[in-house]
Amino acid sequence: MSEVKNGTHVREVTDETFGTEVEAHRGAAIVDLWAEWCGPCRALGPIVDDLAREFEGRVKVAKLDIDNNPVTTARYNVRSIPTLLFFRDGQLVESVVGLRSRNELAARIAKLAA
């Protein structure tokens, strides 16, 4: 089972929970693939947390630590981080690599949730 990260609206997922939490989810979901040692990932984290609050009830937001979850990382061919994976009804519809502005991500999430 995934857990809510530090009281935020973001779920921590693992290789074991990714299928049930993301791929089996009906509706919109985004997954932030990150690592503790990644500076841009640490900069993106608060933005993702804020967007999770803004889109609560419309988009499921999860984080996956790539260092501890190599199966999912390889399955989605993640080669650079941060990477955001956008899913609709369990299907990958878009991926965004690199640090992006809050406004750009909010627009992408709003489109996904529409």
Regions found by a protein language model. Give the residues of each.
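Conserved residues in the N-terminal Rossmann fold of short-chain dehydrogenase/reductase
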Residues: 63
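Proteins that catalyze or organize thiol-disulfide redox chemistry
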Residues: 1-59, 68-83, 88-114
